[in-house]
Each structure stands twice: as C-alpha cells, then as structure tokens.
C-alpha cells in the first residue's frame, strides 16, 4: 500500500501554519503577514507588488489583501512607481523593524521546538528530498505546457 504522502505533507503544512498563526496572534499578525514582511525585508528595497508576489509564489491579487492589512497596521507603504504609474513600490516603515524582529524570534523559537529531537542531518536529508519532489513536480508542469 502506498503512503498518502501528499495528504501527510498538506496536513503538516496546515498544522505548522496554525501553530505559527496561534503564536503570532499576540502581535496581531498571521503566518501570511510574516511571509510577506519577511520577503519585503529580504528583497532589495522598493520591490513592486508583482515582484513581491513572484518572490512569495502567489498571484498578485492574493497579495493585495495582505498588503492592505500591513499598510493599515502602519508596517508598509506603497508608492506609485515613477517609471510605470501602474506599478506600486512597497517599502517597510520604521515601525516594521521591531515587529519583524519580534516575529522572527517567534518563528525561530517555534521552528526550534518543532525540530526538537530531529538531528541536523535528518533536517538536511528532508530538505533534499523536498527539493527533489518540488523539482519533479515542476518538471511535470513543464512537460504538460
């Protein structure tokens, strides 16, 4: 009998995300907010919404709601691009720095607790397997297009 690997991976992602959401609740943020803030922080300043959506791996319309929420919280600003008035550039505000640090602390602590009892070698092997699975899936997409 084959293992339900896809279901197992989906369930793992779901419970991991739920735990992150629970732990970020005191900061009034979610895992989606964290992923967005993290990518804005790591990318060169002034990325467009389109560039950010690609970096995160989501469609731009899906990103807009999260950006609206982060803007309402005063963590980002959006500015019309001078070279393309249709594009908006995203910038972190000064308020974002301490929030990003607090979120990273929560994420690091949670990751450490989740990986408790798992050796670095096992984590590395898992990362390699996940990368190979992703590569296989992307190859299948390319073959069908």
Swiss-Prot record:
Pfam families: MarR. Disruption phenotype: Loss of prodigiosin and carbapenem production. Residues 49-72 bind DNA. One of its GO terms (biological process) is response to stress. The keyword Transcription applies. The keyword Repressor applies. Residues 2-135 form the HTH marR-type domain. GO terms for molecular function: DNA binding; DNA-binding transcription factor activity. Gene3D superfamilies: Winged helix-like DNA-binding domain superfamily/Winged helix DNA-binding domain. PROSITE patterns: HTH_MARR_1, HTH_MARR_2. Keywords: Activator, Antibiotic biosynthesis, DNA-binding, Repressor, Transcription, Transcription regulation. Transcription regulator that can specifically activate or repress expression of target genes. Participates in transcriptional activation of pig (prodigiosin pigment) and car (carbapenem antibiotic) gene clusters. PANTHER family: TRANSCRIPTIONAL REGULATOR SLYA, TRANSCRIPTIONAL REGULATOR, MARR FAMILY. Belongs to the SlyA family. Homodimer. This is Transcriptional regulator SlyA.
